[in-house]
Amino acid sequence: MNGKSVTVTMRVTSMGNTLMHEMRGADRPDDPITMFVVDGDRVLLTHYCDADNRPRMAGTLSPDGKTLDFNFLDVTGNMKYGHMQHATFTFIDANHHVEDWTFQMPGDKPMHAHFDLQRTK
């Protein structure tokens, strides 16, 4: 984001039922956590935001299986600073994916973040 390096760690947890996504950056005071879970025929995410709220989104997989697009469902917690509104994950290959996140600021002003992520060993 803004040319700065971030590290995203993903791991399967809860007996294989949940995927945890943690984003860390050298200049970040805290790490936002996003949890993904399959709920029937859809994928849900809950984003534990450093804005002190927890938006939920439902994902839709593209017909080619390369893009997972998440749309806002609801949010709990503090809304003073805004909330995460939308996320898109584009899968390039097994070691490379892109994440696009939209944070809805107060006054309905969107702020976009783009991450081009590659697996490291």
Question: Model-found features: residue ranges?
Answer:
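Hydrophobic small-molecule pocket/channel-lining residues, especially in calycin-type beta-barrels
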Residues: 1-121
